[in-house]
Every structure is written in structure tokens, then in C-alpha cells.
Amino acid sequence: SIQHVYGAQHPPFDPLLHGTLLKSTAKMPTTPVKAKRVSTFQEFESNTSDAWDAGEDDDELLAMAAESLNSEVVMETANRVLRNHSQRQGRPTLQEGPGLQQKPRPEAEPPSPPSGDLRLVKSVSESHTSCPAESASDAAPLQRSQSLPHAAAVTLGGTSDPGTLSSSALSEREASRLDKFEQLLAGPNTDLEELRKLSWSGIPKPVRPMTWKLLSGYLPANVDRRPATLQRKQKEYFAFIEHYYDSRNDEVHQDTYRQIHIDIPRMSPEALILQPKVTEIFERILFIWAIRHPASGYVQGINDLVTPFFVVFICEYIEAEEVDTVDVSGVPAEVLRNIEADTYWCMSKLLDGIQDNYTFAQPGIQMKVKMLEELVSRIDEQVHRHLDQHEVRYLQFAFRWMNNLLMREVPLRCTIRLWDTYQSEPEGFSHFHLYVCAAFLVRWRKEILEEKDFQELLLFLQNLPTAHWDDEDISLLLAEAYRLKFAFADAPNHYKK
């Protein structure tokens, strides 16, 4: 059976709009949501924001790649980075747990970090077993590697906060990063490990479509083989359409198609989804995937995973200031056909790694929510205890985080930036996503601890004020998730007390 997605809401919660709702429902007989919450949210959004500043802290993180590391070195450096970052912004350091907090924007421009290529950092367990000669060699292959976050000032579509870097320095840096991507992608054989390293801190918009196709495993690293692969896979997809799609009205499949048909108009952004051509494309993609994956079939939540791929691939052919306002009316039919096929295959590659999230009873999600609960109890016991005291269960808010990969918690532009990193990480959509969710929850520790009853806590957790988030917020969230991963990676009992 299909499990409910708790409190699903599109678009992500906007505290300015929600203020009206709170006032209109203030006379409910149940415990009211206090009006003070509105002003708190407004003040919270106007006075604070997250940013990963380019400065000396970047040098410390980059230096982590220069040598084989053990867990003590990793944790000491990462903690120092976050502590120094907090002190520069005048933000108090938490006594309980390493949770993320909002901080004021810097008043002065921080220095730009030096450019340079990064080396892979081995996992904690490998750092203990590596020989000195191997760790000192640039050419030494790594059996299990993970990407180090680069300087996170470069953001979605090559844009950033004007207050972080001067426009000239920013343009020069963007151009340099774009050039590195283009050189890697030009081949003749793209170095996928180097591409993952470079992509961790965000992919420039012009090269994002090809980079995603490579990182997802849809296209080969060899440049000469790519056109033939694209042609073959696109032809294969439309053979599925011809063979299966007419069966959508058969008795055995009509319930699946009906549910897809109902769910698509509920998706976000509405300006994109409600275009008839897009609706038809999404219906075909989801129906064909469900028919070809009978172990899970179609489950609510899978539909959301189509959108980022489709938007990224369509933006290769049209100019859109905001990804939420993409208009496909001027895109040739043949181009739309190719984008549809590419979207199907890339979404399929993603779901191959998390399919147990969507099989009967969704055991993958049940397990990950439990793991999140154990992890949060380790990293911030005060937040965990506060939720428990007010009888808020993780399943009531985190089920959606796992089911939709945080797509309903942050704007689409932030989801795309998040997926840049997920596709750069080993098991990014499953394993690393767990640490991102932990960092995301603890990020709101101050607001969580201020709420004193079940209703207000759950309302807040299901409607987090992220409508105005940008890539800086995602970059800091990813940096904290990366630190948590290093702290707990390869520890056999790291989810248990």
C-alpha cells in the first residue's frame, strides 16, 4: 500500500505568507500557533542568513587533501573551520551539539581563497591503512574516495552573493571554474573522479546537463561514444512508450496511471508542471518506470524526482532567469523528445540506488528515519530530548525528507544545487543524504528549542522557513553534513549509543 507523505506542501513554506494563515486560525479550540511565531520568522529571515565565506577557512579545508588523514586531524580541522567561521560573524558557539545556525551576513568582504586543484581525501578507515608512499603520490588510485568540498562561494548557474566577492573577482573565478569543467568534459576520456571533485561545490549552469548525465552513469566517459549512446538510449525509451503506454487504460494498470494523473498537478513549480506538454511528458516517464519496475511500481514521491532532471536538461535550450518559470512552448518537439528520454534514464539511475525506499511498506525510508533519530541523538542530544519530551516522532516530519529527498523542504533552485553534490558523493542520494538531513534538523535547533508544545513543534518542522534560501545556505548545510560524515564514517556502531 502507499504510505502517506506527512504534511506535503509546495512550494516550501514562506513565513511572510504564513503570517496570514496563523492569524486566521488563532481561534481554533486546539492549542493555537502563537502570533509571535510570525514576527520571529520575519525577523529571523530579514536579519540572518547562511553563507560559506571564502577565506582562510577554505585554506584549512583544502589543506586536508594534502596528506593522508586520521579521524583526529579531520575533526580538529573541521571544527576549527566552523568555529572560526562563527567567531568572525559574531555568532555564539553552541555548548550542546555541533548544530548549524543562522548567522549575520558579513559586513566586510572576505579575501578570496587561492585557486588550485584538489586531491581526493580518503575515508577515515583508509587513512589508517595507507602506506606513506601511496598517500604521498598524486597518481595513487583510491579504491574508496570521497570528494572534498571546494570553496562554496560559486553557486547555482555560476552566481553568488554580491557581498561575498567583488563582481570582477567573481566573474574571473566563475570563468576559471567553467573552463576547468569544459576541459574535463572535452575528453577524449573524461576523468570522472576529477569531475566529481570539481562538481562537489556546485556545477556551472552551462555544463550542468552534460555533467549530470556523466555523474549519473547515463553517458560514458569516452567522448566519441556519447552520441551513439544517446541515440541508442533515446530510441530504446520510445520503444518502451510504443510497447507499454497504450496499456495505461487496461484494468491491471489503470489504478497506477490514475494515481500518476492525480499527483502531477500537485507538484511544484506549478508554472512548469501545468503546461500541457510537460504534464504529458511526466505522465509517460512515470508510467513507463512503474511498469518496468513492478517490485515497487509507482509510489507517491517518485514523481518529484523527475523535475530536477527535466529542468536542468531543458535549460540547455532556453534562457530562464528562475528555474521555476521555465516555458517549454518554444522548444522544438524533437528536442523535447530527447529531453524526455534523457530525464527518464537519469531518474532511473537515481532510483536504482534507493529503490528500497519505494518497495512495499517502504522499508528503506523506515530504516533511514530510524538511523536519523539515532544520529541526531548522538550529535545534539538536547534537540533529540526536546522532541521526545513533546512526543514529536521523527516519522512525522522526516518521512517526507527521505521520500522526496528534501525537495519539498527547499526551493527547486536549492534542490538542483544539492543534487550537484549528491551526484558527486558515493551513495549521495542514500548514505550522504542521511547526514544532510541530520545537519538540516540541527540547523533549526534554536527555533526547535523555543517551541514548547507538540502542535507548534510539528507545524514548524513540516513548514520550515526556507522559501528565500539560496545556494549559500545549501553550501553551509553541505559543509556541516560533510563534517558529520567524517566524524561518523566507518565507525561500525556510529548510529548506536
From Swiss-Prot:
Location of Phosphoserine modifications: 112, 125, 147
GO MF annotations in UniProt: 14-3-3 protein binding; GTPase activator activity; protein homodimerization activity
Region ranges (Disordered): 83-147
Leader sequence residues: none
Keywords: GTPase activation, Phosphoprotein
Domain Rab-GAP TBC positions: 202-426
Residue ranges that the Swiss-Prot or TrEMBL entry lists as coiled coil: none
Subunit structure: Homodimer. Interacts with ACBD3 and ARFGEF1. Interacts with YWHAB, YWHAE, YWHAG, YWHAH, YWHAQ and YWHAZ.
Chain's role: May act as a GTPase-activating protein for Rab family protein(s).
Name used for this protein in its record: TBC1 domain family member 22A
Species name: Macaca fascicularis
Gene name for this UniProt entry: TBC1D22A
